[in-house]
Amino acid sequence: MRYIFHISLLFLFSTLYSSRCIENIEVNLWGQCYSINETFKLNVSGSGLTGSIPLEIGQLTNLYSIDLSNNRLSGEIPAEIGNLHKLDFLYLQDNELSGEIPVEIGNLKDLDRLFLSSNQLSGSIPKSIKNLQDLKYLYLFKNNLSGTIPSEIGELINLFKLDLSSNFFSGEIPLTIGNLVNLNSLRLFNNNLDGDIPLAIYNLNKIEFLFLHNNDFENINKIDLEKIPSLINVKITD
């Protein structure tokens, strides 16, 4: 019994010590200490994390990659994420995150990949998204996002893959979608989009995958897919 007691005390003291970070030099995230200046990559994917994303994550300003995917994180994406100006990759998919996408996401001007899919995010896409001029992958599918698709999305001219499927977006596809001339894949299916599919999609001469089904478009039969010869896989009707 005494041996077990000593082991328990050792475990308690080691746990307390490991979670005691050096003030102004380290931050505590999920019981681990991370150097403020020397943490460049944070990968805790599939670690069974719960609760909210700590606000302190915004202090790790040298991060270029965050992967918190495949956990059970809840609550809102903290606005402090916008402090991470060097971030190239942000993977938050497959969690239970809710609330709106923070406008501060537009501060991440070096971002290459933004994966927020398979969460419970609501509200609209912030117009500050237009600041992400280097963005190549934008995955927002399987959320509760609503409102119209902002015309500002057409300013992301380096986008390679855009997936907004399985949300509650309404209104028309913005004409500016035709500006995305580097787009390889466009997935907008399972939404409440209506009106006409803009003929500007004919400008997407590199697109190979186009999925627009399960919406309420009015001019589906007038779309001439032969004008987009790059297409490999397409579905625009239910």
Task: Please place each PLM-identified region on the residue numbering.
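Short, conserved structural micro-motifs that define repeat-unit consensus positions
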Residues: N43-G48, S74-I77, I125, Y139-K142
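Conserved hydrophobic beta-strand positions in leucine-rich repeat
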Residues: F40-V44, Y64-L68, D88-L92, L111-L116, ...
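Leucine-rich repeat
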Residues: I36, Q59-L63, G82-L87, G106-L111, ...
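Leucine-rich solenoid repeat scaffolds
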Residues: C21, D194-D238
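N-terminal capping/linker segments that flank leucine-rich repeat
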Residues: R2-E56, K227, I232-D238
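The feature encodes a structural signal of leucine-rich repeats
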Residues: I53-L55, S74-A79, I101-V103, I125-K127, ...
